[in-house]
């Protein structure tokens, strides 16, 4: 049987363990013996016969493996606690009106987040436009919002929307340990974009650029 959120159990003749820093390590004759004619890469990938996957995860009592993030994306709090931002971000993105979530917490004493709002959801749930006629393109969505007499600012700066998001954050925080819970958040005036360097062409978030672009907002959550 399977478990939701798990990638399953190990195959026969495969060993899996979690390193002290949370990385998933694999061992088995079928994994790999090394890189062809590249001793340096082999030494970096294989340690004492264990293949370093670069993924961070956990194994439950039934032997099911869960991948919680990439090692290079792991945050370390000021108290030394490892935090996997991707898991928290994806959980918070389940809030209907939220489009993007960016977790802040690396070398900080608590976690905060930057949220952007989903204009399509605003058009559907707040203005009452039929979902089937809402355009997919974000710029066209903003145009429709304007045609209905509103701007995105009416929602990003709304106390009502902030409280709505806060209620959802309070519920979702219960899924995480105290160091992983969001203590504060800010709703940004616009969504992340490729043009501003905040998203890759495949729409993955660029952490360094987002941190640079929104430094003042981030710093305000730690005062």
Where are these regions (language model features)?
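Conserved C-terminal "lid"/linker of ANL adenylate-forming enzymes
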Residues: 100, 166-223
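Conserved ATP-binding/catalytic segment of the ANL
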Residues: 10-77
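Adenylate-forming
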Residues: 45-46, 64-93, 122-157, 179-180, ...
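Membrane-embedded alpha-helical bundles of multi-pass transporters/translocases
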Residues: 58-62, 103-105, 136
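Active-site loops of AMP-binding adenylate-forming
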Residues: 1-5, 38-41, 119
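C-terminal boundary motif of the adenylate-forming
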Residues: 56, 95-121
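Gly/Ser/Thr-rich phosphate-binding loop
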Residues: 1-2, 15, 98-99
């Amino acid at each position: 049987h399977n478990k939701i959120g798990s990638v399953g159990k190990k195959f026969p003749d495969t060993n899996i363990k979690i390193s002290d820093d949370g990385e998933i390590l694999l061992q088995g004759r079928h994994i790999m013996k090394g890189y062809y004619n590249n001793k340096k890469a082999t030494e970096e990938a294989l340690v004492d016969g264990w293949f370093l996957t670069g993924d961070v995860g956990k194994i439950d009592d039934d032997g099911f493996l869960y991948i919680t993030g990439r090692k290079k994306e792991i945050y370390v709090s000021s108290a030394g606690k490892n935090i996997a931002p991707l898991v928290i971000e994806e959980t918070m993105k389940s809030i209907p009106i939220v489009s993007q979530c960016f977790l802040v917490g690396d070398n900080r004493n608590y976690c905060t987040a930057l949220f952007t709002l989903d204009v399509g959801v605003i058009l559907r749930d707040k203005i009452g436009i039929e979902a089937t006629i809402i355009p997919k393109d974000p710029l066209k969505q903003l145009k429709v919002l304007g045609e209905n007499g509103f701007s995105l600012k009416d929602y990003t700066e709304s106390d009502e929307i902030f409280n709505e998001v806060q209620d959802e954050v309070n519920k979702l925080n219960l899924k995480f340990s105290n160091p992983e819970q969001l203590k504060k958040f800010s709703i940004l005036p616009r969504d992340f974009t490729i043009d501003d360097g905040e998203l890759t062409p495949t729409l993955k978030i660029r952490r360094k650029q987002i941190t640079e672009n929104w430094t003042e907002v981030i710093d305000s959550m730690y005062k």
